[in-house]
A protein has these predicted regions:
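N-terminal helical cap/lid subdomain that shapes the substrate entry/recognition surface
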Residues: 1-99, 108-112, 121
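Asp-based, Mg2+/Mn2+-dependent phosphohydrolase catalytic module
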Residues: 1-6, 88, 92-215
Length: 215
C-alpha cells in the first residue's frame, strides 16, 4: 500500500525544545546544564519527562509552578527560530510531491495555534490535549487515522521516540520513521527496538527518499 500521508510528532522532530527547557531551568533557578543533565537521566531511565522537575528539586510542585508562570504572563508559544532548519523545507517538499502532511504530538492545545502562526505547511494540525488522548495510547493513533482520512497502511508517522512514536505507530499499522536527534532520539538509537523502525533518519532532508524506499 503506497504512503500518501506523513504525520509528524512536534517536539524534537520538528521543534528544537532547547528554549522551552531553558526557560524552565531559569524559572527554577538552576543552571541549564544541570537541568539538561537531569533530563538525560530521566530519558535513560525510561521515565516520564515531567519527573525531571522532582529530580532537580525533590517535592517540586509543578502544577503550582505552571500557575505562577501563567500569572506572570508566560504563555506557550513557538517561534520560527525554534524549528530545526530542515523542518520547513521537508514539509514543503512533501506537499510539493503530492503527500498529505499532518502534525500531531503530545502538546498543549495552544501548540496548534502556534504552529499555524509560524506558517507551517500542513493539511491538518492537532494536539493530544484537543484530542483528549496522549501517545503512546492506541486511541491516539486511531485519531490520526480518522483525521487523515485514509487507511493506516497509507500513513507514515515520524518521531524521535521509540516508546511514543515508532512502536505504537507500527502497532497501529503505520510506517514508522525514527529520527535520531534530541535527547530521546540520541538515547533511543541505542535501544534494540530501533531495528523495528521502517526507516531511520539523521535529518528530515532524508525523509522523502526514505519514504520512496519503503513505500
Amino acid at each position: 500500500m503506497p504512503i500518501t500521508t506523513v504525520v509528524f510528532d512536534v517536539g524534537e522532530t520538528l521543534v528544537d525544545e532547547t528554549r522551552h527547557w531553558t526557560d524552565w531551568a531559569d524559572w527554577m533557578g538552576v543552571p541549564a546544564f544541570t537541568f539538561f543533565a537531569a533530563m538525560g537521566v530521566i530519558v535513560e531511565r525510561r521515565r516520564p519527562h515531567r519527573e525531571v522537575f522532582d529530580l532537580v528539586r525533590p517535592g517540586y510542585d509543578l502544577a503550582a509552578a505552571q500557575a505562577s508562570r501563567k500569572a506572570a504572563g508566560w504563555a506557550y508559544s513557538l517561534e520560527r527560530g525554534d524549528f530545526y532548519p530542515d523542518a520547513f523545507p521537508c514539509l514543503a517538499d512533501l506537499r510539493n510531491n503530492g503527500y498529505h502532511v499532518g502534525i500531531s504530538g503530545n502538546q498543549p492545545e495552544a501548540a496548534e495555534a502556534s504552529l499555524r502562526d509560524v506558517g507551517i505547511a500542513a493539511d491538518f494540525i492537532a494536539s493530544s490535549t484537543s484530542w483528549g488522548v496522549e501517545k503512546p495510547s492506541p486511541a491516539f493513533f486511531d485519531r490520526v487515522v480518522e483525521v487523515a482520512g485514509c487507511p493506516a497502511g497509507e500513513i507514515a508517522y515520524v518521531g524521535d521516540r521509540l516508546d511514543n512514536d515508532v512502536l505504537p505507530a507500527k502497532a497501529a499499522g503505520m510506517t514508522a520513521v525514527f529520527i535520531r536527534r534530541g535527547p530521546w532520539g540520541i538515547v533511543h538509537a541505542g535501544w534494540p527496538d530501533v531495528a523495528r523502525a521502517d526507516a531511520r533518519l539523521e535529518s528530515l532532508s532524508e525523509l522523502r527518499a526514505a519514504l520512496e524506499a519503503v513505500g
